[in-house]
A protein has these predicted regions:
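An acidic/histidine-cluster motif and surrounding catalytic segment
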Residues: 1-79, 84-185
Length: 185
């Protein structure tokens, strides 16, 4: 996972934080070591800080810890998964959006990809959608994050919001949440 903090319009002024998880099992040791060799070759940022986990934290715990640590320190954060290729103006778009919506309490997350497949939409638009592929947030919004899937599901069901949560029945978020909860046991 890559976190960019205080990135400006130019990548060379961005602070890059890389969170590298440890392997789950001996079979993945070689792949993890290959990734670690690669991340040590990255350049082109003002600073690069690499956090290499000594044990396997798992995806959720690693992301939650990384985002929480950096957003609490910097007040905002841009998050990327490690296998993404971004557009040349990605940082400009994210930083501009973080600035424009910084005080808009109804906006808690900037998403950098569009799954709607609706070509009639403008280049930027508001949508009730969150995702993990290139996103950004502020400490004011992250403080509301609750990683407890059981609690979220209970709240959605109590308020009859599962269809709304599923993007009006267009995406199976509730099913994904139930699977996550099953995996938490």
């Amino acid at each position: 996972m890559f976190l960019l903090c205080y990135a400006t319009k130019k990548q060379q002024t961005a602070l890059l934080f890389i969170y590298a998880d440890q392997s789950k099992n001996p079979e993945s040791d070689a792949a993890v070591q290959e990734v670690r060799r690669y991340i040590h070759s990255i350049s082109g940022f003002k600073t690069i800080t690499i956090i290499e986990r000594e044990t396997n934290w798992g995806l959720a715990r690693n992301i939650i810890d990384g985002v929480t640590t950096q957003v609490n320190h910097f007040g905002r954060v841009i998050v990327l998964e490690d296998d993404l290729i971004v557009a040349p103006y990605f940082l400009k778009f994210m930083n501009d959006a973080l600035e424009v919506y910084k005080d808009e309490q109804r906006v808690g997350h900037i998403q950098a990809c569009d799954f709607t497949k609706d070509i009639s939409l403008p280049d930027t638009f508001l949508i009730k959608w969150t995702g993990s592929w290139g996103w950004a947030t502020w400490s004011r919004a992250w403080k509301h994050f609750n990683p407890d899937g059981k609690e979220l599901l209970a709240q959605l069901e109590a308020r009859n919001l599962t269809r709304y949560f599923d993007f009006n029945g267009n995406y199976p978020f509730t099913r994904m949440l139930c699977r996550q909860i099953e995996g938490e046991k």
